[in-house]
């Protein structure tokens, strides 16, 4: 399946993003709970702050996009370490690849970042172009339905070593619509 058709039952979440302290806009993202419910729910709870550790909400608010590669993808979600090494999930540890039904067939698709088979956690990336070589390796679980320009603004931030943005790219606010 190239891209899932929108479904009224699927949750829609949002990221408000700032670059270098300046708000640049909002991305609205449909989560494909109808195709990959466990993966979508993990992401949704990190957007809303519903998941708590020791009574404290944990999730994407205040975290960064720590890796940006123009014409490929923008990666974020490491609210543990902020550098791409952190792993957390609502399932207490890394979780399995749910399925690979959806493909990396277009820009604006949300997919799980991982370090090999069944190592999903909190990190994700958003495709900036078709990335079919990732099919069967990373779980696609959502798509930007509004705010593709915000993704393009992030994609064009200057980067340094390890594709780290030279300006902080921060999820200043997030939640469910």
Curated annotation (Swiss-Prot):
Major localization class: nucleus
Gene3D superfamilies registered for this protein in UniProt: Cyclophilin-like
Top EC group: isomerase
Positions of the PPIase cyclophilin-type domain: 14-176
Keyword set includes Chaperone: yes
Reactions it catalyzes: [protein]-peptidylproline (omega=180) = [protein]-peptidylproline (omega=0)
GO BP, sorted A to Z: mRNA splicing, via spliceosome; positive regulation of viral genome replication; protein folding; protein-containing complex assembly
Entry's EC annotation: 5.2.1.8
Notes on how activity is controlled: Inhibited by cyclosporin A.
Keywords, sorted A to Z: Acetylation, Chaperone, Cytoplasm, Isomerase, mRNA processing, mRNA splicing, Nucleus, Rotamase, Spliceosome
Subunit structure, interactors included: Interacts directly with PRPF4. Part of a heteromeric complex containing PPIH, PRPF3 and PRPF4 that is stable in the absence of RNA. Component of the U4/U6-U5 tri-snRNP complex composed of the U4, U6 and U5 snRNAs and at least PRPF3, PRPF4, PRPF6, PRPF8, PRPF31, SNRNP200, TXNL4A, SNRNP40, DDX23, CD2BP2, PPIH, SNU13, EFTUD2, SART1 and USP39. Heterodimer with PRPF18.
Name of the protein this chain belongs to: Peptidyl-prolyl cis-trans isomerase H
